[in-house]
């Protein structure tokens, strides 16, 4: 049983449980979201985790958290409530060194290869390895699946069972979802993109041949980092064939970054709405 489609609030978790026939399930997987310190602690009171996952840390929601240290503190609330062990992404593991629960640095993935039609990688547990492929795009997808694999292994699934499940994972709507239409590849990454997600999406875009066009309103909810991160985003777009910026305020630092990195002014435009773009 899982919480559906980013239903990561107290009401969302409660609805998932109340609407299910619990006797049909052995495991409940709950997504926990936060915009303020204390939000995850509240969710853990409702649903205390046996095994928890921290998939990463970035500046998303700094507008409401205020500081990066508050983001780390909020994520750490799940570790304070974890009964068995926590699986933590390698690139942020050290941020949680002071928490007492058993912590596992996600290290079961290796030899990641990225293609237009998916991602191949190796999963290894207790000296046994399996080569797997997912239709999900980008190296970050391999690392996200590895986190899930660590959790699955922790609750008793075998490596073969995990490996067989990887190809069955489907696209998540609006999260780097590949849509083929009339000979055109569309990467729909429209859901609440953060800094890491935007960088990953651009790397995936580079895997494809042909003209590369990006439509973006910029990155939101970054607080004091909003100007800097949107400027950096603009620099990363400078080598593309065309860029369409949507909106008014956030797109200005994106355009400045684009120009700073040598982007062609004839290949970028600003439109007021997504429909106009």
Regions found by a protein language model. Give the residues of each.
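Phosphate-binding loop of NTP-binding sites
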Residues: 1-90, 95-99
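Acidic, Mg2+-coordinating active-site environments of NTP-dependent enzymes
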Residues: 53-186, 210-211, 234-242, 251-268
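Short, intrinsically disordered, charge-balanced linker/junction segments flanking boundaries
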Residues: 270-277
